A protein has these predicted regions:
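Short, glycine/acidic-enriched capping/hinge loops at junctions between secondary-structure elements
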Residues: 15-16, 39, 55-57
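Short cationic amphipathic helices and targeting signals
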Residues: 1-4, 41-46
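C-terminal structural segments of small proteins and small subunits
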Residues: 48-84
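Short, conserved beta-strand edge motifs with alternating hydrophobic and charged residues
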Residues: 4-6, 27-28
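Amphipathic, hydrophobic secondary-structure cores in small proteins
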Residues: 26-44
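Short hydrophobic/aromatic-enriched beta-strand-loop microsegments
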Residues: 24-29, 65-68
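Helix N-cap motif at beta-to-alpha junctions
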Residues: 7-11, 46-51
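Short amphipathic alpha-helix segments
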Residues: 8-25
Length: 84
């Protein structure tokens, strides 16, 4: 799952909070070019199972999320579905 945020600083804050609270590893990564619409080029990558926890963590820590995508593979190509 990719969580798009406004800046690398915000991505780092979300990553640290997520790892501390849910225990899943989270990574600050470059946003895939298919998702980057001229905005921040960094997002947080975390396990899809953490969706509800990520939303709660972001809300509790006043971290604005621009969009959340789930990645899947269709016919050998990556496809991104908008979650929110």
């Amino acid at each position: 799952m990719y969580i798009l945020v406004g800046s690398v600083t915000t991505a780092t804050r979300l990553k640290k909070a997520a790892e501390k609270i849910i225990g899943f590893p989270a990574y600050v990564v470059h946003t895939p070019s298919a998702l980057n619409q001229g905005r921040c080029s960094y997002s947080v990558r975390v396990d899809d199972r953490a969706l509800n926890e990520i939303r709660k963590i972001a809300g509790d820590n006043e971290i604005p999320i621009r969009r959340i995508y789930i990645e899947r593979t269709v016919n050998g190509e990556r496809v991104y579905d908008v979650v929110s």
